[in-house]
Regions:
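A short helix-loop-beta-strand connector motif used in the catalytic cores of GNAT acetyltransferases and
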Residues: 36-56, 77, 187-201, 299-301
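Conserved active-site alpha-helix within GNAT-family acetyltransferase domains
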Residues: 106-110, 115-134, 259-275
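Intrinsically disordered, low-complexity, positively biased terminal segments
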Residues: 1-7, 11-12, 16, 20, ...
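N-terminal, Lys/Arg-enriched amphipathic/low-complexity engagement segments
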Residues: 14, 21-47, 55-79
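Conserved acetyl-CoA pyrophosphate-binding loop and the N-cap/start of the following alpha-helix
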Residues: 87-99, 233-237
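Conserved beta-strand in the GNAT
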Residues: 47, 53-63, 75-77, 82, ...
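A short, polar/charged loop-to-alpha-helix boundary motif
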Residues: 64-72, 138, 218-226
Length: 391
């Protein structure tokens, strides 16, 4: 078995593997190739070879995520995890994932996320579920009119900057929201070759307070790609707009963060809300990730944190973590640990959901010193986790 980052013509070989794994043998792989061309400057693919050639792949896209209002960190978005059937069960995909972790660390990518085909499989390699979200389904015939809807209008290309600013302000309320680049925004807001994209804005006093956008859909149910409201009146206004679609759409569906105020705006027996995990996340490099984080400026303390990480051995040791005035310093220590946790639990604490308190209640960490535990709580206090993208 040989593992390496693919280069040049080797990249074409990935489509054979991905087609078998994801597209039932499609030879064109048109959408994959078009998307790959758009993001090629920010991705790398780790391949595993044996005597028969390329057998397994992991693709990593170097992107960035918000961690509250002040911090944006590099994040390795993992996808394209695939292995040809004849060599499954031999550890090839796992080797590719470990190789991807090494490459991310070498490139200064301290965190990672992925959307799993199996939660348990990726947990073996250090990723863990992070964040919860609500999937909302609302029938249009139960929605109410609202006078604020008179301040809603269709977006134009000139509104792009205001939409991005609205999203950025909203994203700063959470840990995990993508700091989207132009490619991502084009994919969300531009028309596709087949369908128009409809984007509507709520604006008051020259300030864009919310927007929603969708493309395509069916009469029975239409998926709203993004429904963001920074104020309660913006949410009421946009819900009122959805009511005006009653003749075209029976139900609208969208994802929202777990603190979404929908139920304070409107509730009805026919509203369906499903609670689910948001995604899986991982700390790739403990000192790099922790020093990129900014705790509250009023918080200060020291914790000796023992981390266990079987797939990234550079993380497995005890770290002295000191923080004050919004800055974190991390260095190895031989002192007895205050708190012990595996990389999965640390990753959850880092992204904010579940909280340190919830992890302790679930026996996901071991406390040896209460003062150190109190410092750990203060270190990771802050916004909850949410992401409204996939990859």
């Amino acid at each position: 078995m040989e593992l390496r980052v693919l280069a040049g013509a080797e990249q074409e070989q990935t489509y054979y593997v991905w087609s078998q794994a994801f597209e039932r043998g499609d030879r064109e792989m048109r959408q994959w190739k078009e998307w790959g061309e758009k993001i090629k400057e920010q991705t790398f693919t780790v391949g595993v070879f044996d005597a028969a050639g390329l057998q397994a792949t992991v693709l990593v896209m170097n992107t960035r995520v918000h961690l509250g209002p002040e911090v944006i960190v590099a994040m390795g978005a993992v996808g394209g995890v695939a292995c040809l059937p004849a060599t499954r069960g031999k550890g090839y995909a796992g080797a590719a994932l470990k190789g991807a972790l090494e490459q991310m660390r070498a490139q200064g990518i301290w965190t990672s996320m992925l959307f799993p085909f199996s939660w348990e499989y990726y947990r073996r390699f250090g990723w863990e579920w992070i964040g919860t979200q609500r999937r909302c389904v609302l029938p249009t015939n139960i929605l109410r009119s609202d006078p604020e809807t008179e301040h809603v209008r269709a977006a134009t290309p000139a509104d792009r900057a205001a939409i991005l600013a609205c999203y950025t302000q909203f994203a700063g309320q959470y840990r995990g929201m993508l700091a989207r680049d132009e490619v991502a925004w084009n994919d969300i807001l531009d028309h596709s070759k087949k369908e128009y994209t409809y984007t509507y804005l709520y604006e008051r006093d020259g300030d864009l307070e919310g927007y929603l956008t969708f493309r395509g859909g069916k009469e029975e149910e239409t998926w709203i790609r993004e429904f963001i409201s920074r104020t309660p009146r913006a949410q009421r206004a946009l819900l009122g707009l959805l009511r005006r679609h009653e003749m075209q759409v029976n139900k609208f569906r969208w994802n929202a963060p777990d603190d979404d105020p929908l139920w304070s705006q409107f509730y009805h027996w026919d509203i369906e809300v499903k609670i689910m995990p948001a995604t899986m996340g991982r700390v790739v490099d403990v000192p790099g990730a922790l020093q990129a984080w900014k705790p509250a400026r009023s918080a200060q303390g020291t914790v000796h944190l023992a981390v266990q990480d079987e797939c990234a051995p550079w993380n497995s040791r005890t770290w002295r973590v000191e923080f004050e005035d919004g800055k974190v310093e991390v260095r190895p220590t031989d002192a007895p640990p205050h708190v012990r946790m595996d990389i999965q639990a640390l990753s959850q604490a880092y992204f904010g959901t579940p909280t340190v308190e919830a992890l302790r209640a679930a026996d996901r960490l071991t406390v040896e010193d209460e003062t150190g535990y109190t410092a750990l709580r203060a270190l990771f206090a802050g916004p909850m986790m949410w992401i409204n993208d996939d990859f």
